[in-house]
From Swiss-Prot:
Modified residues (Phosphothreonine): T511
Residue positions where N-acetylalanine is found in the record: A2
Cofactor(s) named in the record: heme; NADP(+)
One GO term describing the cellular component: peroxisomal membrane
Compartment(s) of residence: Peroxisome matrix
Pfam families the UniProt entry points to: Catalase, Catalase-rel
Gene that this sequence comes from: CAT
Residues binding NADP(+), per UniProt: H194, S201, R203, N213, K237, W303, H305, K306
Residues at the active site: H75, N148
Record keywords, A-Z: Acetylation, Heme, Hydrogen peroxide, Iron, Metal-binding, Mitogen, NADP, Oxidoreductase, Peroxidase, Peroxisome, Phosphoprotein
Binding-site positions, heme: Y358
Protein name (record): Catalase
């Protein structure tokens, strides 16, 4: 292996060396029939037409035509790896989940890192939140902790999620990323201020995937063996140390090595530098939740660590690269509704929305039997239920067992110990407007107390450098929001915008919009 090449670059050579003592496999069709000639199609004479009987060609071409599956609507670009979670501290007083059963217990895991808004071919070094999803293969089925690298999010009501993502994606006419769309949405929804401030800070462009923290972000509920429950948040802190990329380095890498994050993770694991994260929880009792100064289920806010300290739980360690990217990373499906006994959902509205949205998009992208795909299969649990058939049913379809319940033939029975924790709710049923639920207090604390002067300066520069491409009226709305956080925050951004706006005229792509018709006025006049 050439000394100048990294393991990712030498993957093909490494594969060959591993098989050096083996004879080459016999080339076959998808049905296993040996292939005599893979380089030439069957024709009538050297210049004649192809024959339909050339099943080697049709088998190859038909499969090629169907290689791609729908891209994830968000988190399309990603890297994956496998490893284990090891318990280092006892939290059984909070949760009966088997994953936390005893100190020293190891549970296999799969992890996928990702950017959010970009397509599958986009650069790893863009300013964007990072997905940090963990699948725990437990004896009680899979637990999917579908987190990000930030403890907060842009919105607190799931009905806004499609519009939020649309604003971050491409303009429906120009098919270009549109700063007007991005900043118009953010400026109209000031609950985004906290996440926007985090995003445009130094941590907005992590140095690969190994040097960033992860967060479950949502509020969850833990239930112990006595049926006692608490609310919790999950944190996983990088043991490699936080490292971020400068704007300049990120821009350079996006051209020189757009797959920088994937390459860095693969090479680290291939050379035995296994990345790890220390796993923590925060705990809040139900009584504390009742007297908390704000909604403890609000995804745009954090729980202060001084009041709700981090409690160590264990370690996440990644020690295996994917054997095949498509099989183990592109097809992996994380679902927040996959929660074994001892871990449950809270009233967090965004979490509640994701409980439906994630399995729904997996059924669209991968098919209704996506849990049969090996990387998604809960292989450490025995799956026994009354679900049958459907496209791509890849197992024994549970044989001749009854497919209805209840029945009198000894088929799977319900497990009372798996009953969810009961809780009583009362209140008015309506659509509650949460747009103005204190959008600035924690952002102000972040700006004043967490960031130093140099970091605040870079934050304002990063925001202004992006906001400058939006229209002036949108700039004004955004600056007004930042000013409400802190006068200096708004004034520094405005000063930078004034400089940008004085240096060059605003460029705009004008489109004709008319309700109920796609025809421009001139086109209609010519009808």
């Amino acid at each position: 292996m050439a000394d100048s090449r990294d393991p990712a670059s030498d993957q093909m050579q490494h594969w060959k060396e591993q098989r050096a003592a083996q004879k080459a496999d016999v080339l076959t069709t998808g049905a296993g029939n040996p292939v005599g000639d893979k380089l030439n199609v069957i024709t009538v004479g050297p210049r004649g037409p192809l024959l339909v009987q050339d099943v080697v060609f049709t088998d190859e071409m038909a499969h090629f035509d169907r290689e791609r599956i729908p891209e994830r609507v968000v988190h399309a670009k990603g890297a994956g790896a496998f490893g284990y979670f090891e318990v280092t501290h006892d939290i059984t007083k909070y949760s009966k989940a088997k994953v936390f059963e005893h100190i020293g217990k190891k549970t296999p895991i799969a992890v996928r890192f990702s950017t959010v808004a970009g397509e599958s071919g986009s650069a790893d070094t863009v300013r964007d939140p990072r997905g940090f999803a963990v699948k725990f293969y437990t004896e009680d089925g899979n637990w999917d902790l579908v987190g990000n690298n930030t403890p907060i999010f842009f919105i607190r009501d799931p009905i806004l999620f499609p519009s939020f993502i649309h604003s971050q994606k491409r303009n429906p006419q120009t098919h270009l990323k549109d700063p007007d769309m991005v900043w118009d949405f953010w400026s109209l929804r000031p609950e985004s201020l906290h996440q926007v401030s985090f995003l445009f800070s130094d941590r907005g462009i992590p140095d690969g995937h190994r040097h960033m923290n992860g967060y479950g972000s949502h509020t969850f509920k833990l239930v112990n063996a006595n049926g006692e429950a608490v609310y919790c948040k999950f944190h996983y802190k990088t043991d490699q140390g936080i490292k971020n990329l400068s704007v300049e380095d990120a821009a350079r890498l996006s051209q020189e090595d757009p797959d920088y994050g994937i390459r860095d993770l693969f090479n680290a694991i291939a050379t035995g530098k296994y990345p790890s994260w220390t796993f923590y929880i925060q705990v809040m009792t139900f009584n504390q939740a009742e007297t908390f100064p704000f909604n403890p289920f609000d995804l745009t806010k954090v729980w202060p660590h001084k009041d709700y300290p981090l409690i160590p739980v264990g370690k996440l360690v990644l020690n295996r690269n994917p054997v095949n990217y498509f099989a183990e990373v592109e097809q992996i499906a994380f679902d927040p509704s996959n929660m074994p006994p001892g871990i449950e959902a809270s009233p967090d509205k965004m979490l509640q929305g994701r409980l439906f949205a994630y399995p729904d998009t997996h059924r669209h992208r991968l098919g209704p039997n996506y849990l049969h795909i090996p990387v998604n299969c809960p292989y450490r649990a025995r799956v026994a239920n009354y679900q049958r058939d459907g496209p791509m049913c890849m197992q024994d379809n549970q044989g001749g067992a009854p497919n209805y319940y209840p029945n009198s033939f000894g088929a799977p029975e319900q497990q009372p110990s798996a009953l969810e924790h009961s809780i009583q709710y009362s209140g008015e049923v309506r659509r509650f407007n949460t747009a103005n639920d204190d959008n600035v207090t924690q952002v102000r604390a972040f700006y004043v107390n967490v960031l130093n002067e140099e970091q605040r300066k870079r934050l304002c520069e990063n925001i202004a450098g992006h906001l400058k491409d939006a229209q002036i009226f949108i700039q004004k709305k955004a600056v007004k929001n930042f000013t409400e956080v802190h006068p200096d925050y708004g004034s520094h951004i405005q000063a930078l915008l004034d400089k940008y706006n004085a240096e060059k005229p605003k460029n705009a792509i004008h489109t004709f919009v008319q309700s109920g018709s796609h025809l421009a006025a001139r086109e209609k006049a010519n009808l």
